[in-house]
Amino acid sequence: MILLDGTIVNIAIPDVLTSFQTGFSQVEWVMNAYLLAFAVLLITTGRFGDLYGRKLFFILGGLFFTLASLACGLAPTIGWLIGFRALQGLGGAMMMPNTLSIIANVFMPEERGKAMGFWGAVSGVSLALGPSLGGVLVDTASWRWIFIINVPIGILLIVLAFHFVPESTDPLSVKQIDYPGVAVLTIALFALSFALIEGQKYGWASSLILGLFTVAVVGLVLFILIQRRQVQPLMDLSLFRNRTFSVTNAVAALLMFGMMGVFFLLPVFLQAILGYSAIKAGLVMTPLAAIVIVASPLSGILSDRIGQRWLMFGGMLIAALGFYLTRRVMVMDGSWQSMVVPFVISGFGIGMVTPPSTSAVMGSVVPEKAGQASGVISSVRQIGSLLGIAVMGAVLQNRAVSYLRTGIGDKLDAAPFVLPPGAKEEILDAVASSAVNMGEMRAGGGIGASLPEGVAGSLSQMPASVAGQVADFFRDLFSMDFIMGEFAHAMRTTYLFSVIIMVVGALLATAVSARVKRTRGSGP
């Protein structure tokens, strides 16, 4: 349910934009509110489960997730939806770490591998089914049903867990909860996310955005200092002294950074720009997710034979190639057939990286540190996802505004009539303030549904002989084809950024030890 929710929501992004007639940055918060709560609380809720009962926290998490899902489906405004998504993230963070602890407690050592394999298979199926199931729900019902569908599933989960899952604790493994670390990391990541997502709106050089970047930097420094002084820190920084551990975590973060940024933008391109239905967009995206299921076990087998370094290196480069080829077919007259091969290549590369990165991290630590290492890489991956959506969204908004200002400015310079004084700058300022609001554009017919009041008044006073010419000019200037063409251009630039991220990750992977032996008892 948790993993399915992570992929099913992406396909509903364009409909959420239209439903609330909101901006792209607000929809980024729909994703990042969930990821922020999930990433920061993942390790802490796992430790609460060890202290007070894994079954208890699993059921409480299921209850939180189910109620928050219902609230998301009924949300009256985008603000309420964002808040309820954060509660969903809390529920997910309470459930996820305790699922693995419950499996480890319920199954005997000789059966544990099979149980973990089944857990992984369910995770893979959830990843593959998310886009197509989301498309069906959005087109046949409403985007709200991608959340409401969790309610009966959640109720069933709670009932089954209550009756069939035994309670277990491990209080000796937890000496204290790192509340200061949780608080400081939450503030730092929130400040960084807000600055990246809202920078285009408030201005990158504004005191608010610069202040938030400062808070993020200071917060991260304080977090490191707190971790060094805690008896049982949220993240054991001593683990990062191991080169393989630190580099592999960086590679894992970059993979999720590039992957989630791409997964977030792709449904918008398919639906808002190519005009695909949600069902069609979901089906088109399915090969990208499904091929991960094929590549992951293959990569896991190969990592035991040839080592993790070159699998991670090759996988990141293959994913970079897939993203680059996807970028080339992101054009206004693109077809779904042209996207199949790039999607398959991208999915294969992603699947090649995940198992060896997990294996390298778990094999680089002593058995006593395996639980902490697992928690660190899980949190690092979620933080990578969080920043990927924020940064890629910021790049898209910045480039979209820039390209639209340039394109519209060139057209205004070539206008067959003389514009009123100051009209060009007023129009371009209006473009800058509304270009990122794709929801209003899709619902209202374009940026130019209404000209700035002063410009409209001046144009209405122009001679009747040119009135028709003026109307035709502005109708063409603000046509949806032109606007969406510039957005497609901005998305191609954004995808190029993701290609660079994956190449950097590939280069980092070469610093991993040639073959990391999995330490006995160090986990899956």
Regions found by a protein language model. Name each.
Residues 222-225, 232, 244, 359, ...:
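Transmembrane-helix exit segments and adjacent C-terminal regions of multi-pass membrane proteins
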Residues 1-38, 42, 80, 122, ...:
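Transmembrane core module of solute transporters
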Residues 42, 46-181, 207-208, 304:
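Helix-loop-helix hairpins in multi-pass membrane proteins, especially solute transporters
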Residues 159-179, 202, 225-234, 331-332, ...:
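Helix-loop junctions on the cytosolic side of multi-pass membrane transporters
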Residues 26, 111-118, 369-376:
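Cytoplasmic loop-to-transmembrane helix junctions
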Residues 123, 129-131, 339-438, 510:
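Small-residue-rich alpha-helical segments with characteristic i,i+4
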